[in-house]
Amino acid sequence: MTKSELMEKLSAKQPTLSAKEIENMVKDILEFISQSLENGDRVEVRGFGSFSLHHRQPRLGRNPKTGDSVNLSAKSVPYFKAGKELKARVDVQA
């Protein structure tokens, strides 16, 4: 689902809110999560999951095009861990 599709579904579910209000709310939520991660904070949405940063150590990588070794510096990457309720909802036993 894209951000636009999410806004359309929210608009259909909440007809009293304008499309612009929904767009602003979705953008604000994503911005708050991004700012928190940028500040090194963890964001937890109970029952859904948590967003945090994982730190990657510097390592020796390889350029896939040339095969040359490349030194990759340390970096932080966003990480999402699903909560118990979300895991239970998507774990459909066939």
UniProtKB/Swiss-Prot annotation:
The keyword Chaperone does not apply. GO terms for cellular component: chromosome; cytosol. CDD domains: IHF_B. Gene3D superfamilies: IHF-like DNA-binding proteins. SMART domains: BHL. Keywords: DNA recombination, DNA-binding, Transcription, Transcription regulation, Translation regulation. It comes from the Bacteria. GO terms for molecular function: DNA binding; structural constituent of chromatin. GO terms for biological process: DNA recombination; regulation of DNA-templated transcription; regulation of translation. The keyword Transcription applies. InterPro entries: Hist_DNA-bd, Histone-like_DNA-bd_CS, IHF-like_DNA-bd_dom_sf, IHF_beta. It holds the Pfam family Bac_DNA_binding. This protein is one of the two subunits of integration host factor, a specific DNA-binding protein that functions in genetic recombination as well as in transcriptional and translational control. Heterodimer of an alpha and a beta chain. Belongs to the bacterial histone-like protein family. This is Integration host factor subunit beta. It comes from Haemophilus influenzae (strain PittEE). The gene is ihfB.
